[in-house]
């Protein structure tokens, strides 16, 4: 979509439920001016380098390194930039997508993006800023998970599975999309009628009603960012396992 010396933006997956894009920002690169979305959540997961987020009525500056997650639910003022001296790479999520892809292509001027309201919008406490150290941890015999975000429109969990895990059998979700960004692998995914091996950096999406499952494709541990949009009660079921 965009590939210039100072920045690269690639859309990895585009569904009604969410759109996921991969960003590369060189030092000094900035996102849009502070803004709000009235009807959807704007979220970020840092892959490499450091991203500075400005959140809330006072534009509190928070710096995020790899593994950290930030989210601005509806009506939380936010923006972002690379304020460091090295390259930053990160994922950006709009949940639901609401035509964000076409907005980035210059074809949706009515997209849900607005100037900050006079009252500054919702408080900073409504935003999400999660580090691996303060994330909720869920541990099981063959797996461990970090809950990065649990909002009405999105659940985001960093999942790690050790060798010996038997995998997740093919299944469906009727009410939400189940998506994966592979961090460590390889991972074998079954989606619809296809089975493919996904290496780190691969995005996999199972829209509502699509059969999907996964398992190890090698002897190494596997790790991925798992996104449920909307949540569909997934985290509650996971906590009960």
What are these regions (language model features)?
Residues 1-21, 27, 33, 105-155, ...:
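A short, N-terminal "cap"/entry segment at the start of jelly-roll beta-barrel domains
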Residues 18, 50, 58-60, 152-154, ...:
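Well-ordered beta-strand scaffold positions
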Residues 24-25, 36-53, 93-95, 160-162, ...:
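Short, conserved beta-strand element in jelly-roll/cupin
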Residues 32-34, 53-54, 62, 72, ...:
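Short beta-strand His + acidic residue motifs that chelate non-heme Fe in jelly-roll/DSBH
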Residues 43, 50-52, 77, 87, ...:
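Structural motif
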Residues 58-74, 193-208:
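Short acidic-glycine-tyrosine-enriched beta hairpin
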Residues 81-134, 213-241:
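Double-stranded beta-helix
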């Amino acid at each position: 979509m965009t590939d210039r010396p100072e920045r690269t933006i690639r859309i990895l997956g585009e569904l009604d439920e969410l759109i996921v894009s991969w960003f590369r920002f060189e030092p000094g690169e900035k996102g849009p001016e502070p803004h709000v979305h009235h009807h959807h959540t704007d979220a970020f997961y840092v892959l490499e380098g450091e991203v500075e987020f400005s959140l809330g009525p006072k534009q509190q500056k928070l710096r995020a390194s790899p593994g950290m997650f930030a989210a601005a639910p509806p009506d939380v003022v936010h923006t972002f930039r690379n304020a460091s001296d090295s390259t930053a790479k990160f994922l950006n999520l709009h949940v639901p997508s609401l035509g964000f892809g076409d907005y980035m292509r210059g074809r949706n001027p009515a997209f849900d993006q607005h100037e900050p309201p006079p009252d500054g919008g919702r408080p900073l406490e409504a935003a999400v800023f999660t580090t691996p150290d303060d994330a909720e941890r869920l541990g099981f015999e063959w797996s461990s998970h970090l809950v990065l975000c649990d909002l009405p429109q999105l659940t985001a969990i960093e999942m790690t599975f050790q060798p010996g895990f038997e995998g997740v059998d093919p299944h469906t979700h009727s009410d939400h999309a189940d998506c994966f960004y592979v961090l460590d692998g390889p991972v074998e995914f079954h989606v619809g009628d296809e089975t493919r091996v996904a290496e780190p950096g691969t995005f996999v999406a199972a829209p509502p009603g699509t059969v999907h499952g996964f398992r190890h494709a090698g002897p190494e541990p596997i790790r991925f960012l798992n996104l449920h949009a909307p949540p569909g009660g997934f985290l509650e079921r996971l906590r009960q396992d």
